[in-house]
Amino acid sequence: MFKAGALWLLILGAVHSTSLFIKQVPANDTERQILDLMTSYRFNLSGSLRSMSDLMRGFSVAFMLAPLAFGVLDLVLSRERAGLLKRVALVQIIWLAAMIVVALRYFFAVPLSFLVVALLIFVLAWLKLPADASN
């Protein structure tokens, strides 16, 4: 199950990366105005001029990199002893639960569903993995 969780995180990151290549097309004049302002109006953030579009792109890239990095880390660790994997699965559970709280407030159904599936896989992995006998 642990390796399945790692693979699911890689899928999550890969699917999210596709959003970085899709250009938003406004459906009406209001959306056109919003998108124009999001890309053209710049905020002075401690001397750096950034648009709302820049900020959203940065957060989107970070959201893509986190599951990719955690998925790779999990694959690298997947052959380690069960006790370590159980602790890493718990860390994944905590991180994913926090992400789900954020997703419930700010995201929509697709990213939320991917996060929930990842959480369920790691909960099952945690339940299935035996505790480390050396502790």
For each predicted feature, which ranges?
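Residues within membrane-spanning alpha-helices of integral membrane proteins
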Residues: A6-G13, S60, M64, A89, ...
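Juxtamembrane membrane-water interface segments that cap and precede transmembrane helices
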Residues: T39-L55
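Individual transmembrane alpha-helix segments
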Residues: S51-L65
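Hydrophobic alpha-helical transmembrane segments of integral membrane proteins
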Residues: A82-L119
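Juxtamembrane helix-break-helix junctions at the cytosolic face
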Residues: A69-K86
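Juxtamembrane non-transmembrane "cap" segments at the membrane-aqueous interface
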Residues: V25-L37
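Alpha-helical transmembrane segments and their membrane-interface exit regions
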Residues: V117-L129
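N-terminal signal-anchor transmembrane alpha helix
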Residues: F2-N28
